């Protein structure tokens, strides 16, 4: 904006612009862990980005399940065409989430996947990812804050949460600021 490259009104009239976030820095200065990019092939060597989604990208569970089934049904096809593997996705995601944990969490931080619940269109994916990552799937009501520390309610009592992989749209993240 200051350089005059991007018009101010383009930013300030965007429905995803969050003035409440001005001056805030994310933990570890990590602005996004996952970005879903939809590519379209335009020719032999050409690609165009159709959409990028850094907020709450979804669809990876279907891709992973599809690939597993396709490899089972057509193993020769994958060998002949040197199709790159994708089965390490959840390992890489877990490593990224662990790397974002605060130092006090140690080598095995408590990570949760935060979902809006079973009525969300991407709930299958939230459940799938939590299962593959080996972490808890939680809703907002499962969490509470005490002395600036997030805890998860469990049958064994409160358990500290070190990393939240949120799968809630920005508009519904904080009911004191955004939509309720």
Each language-model region and where it sits:
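Domain-scale recognition of functional cores that engage charged ligands
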Residues: 1-180
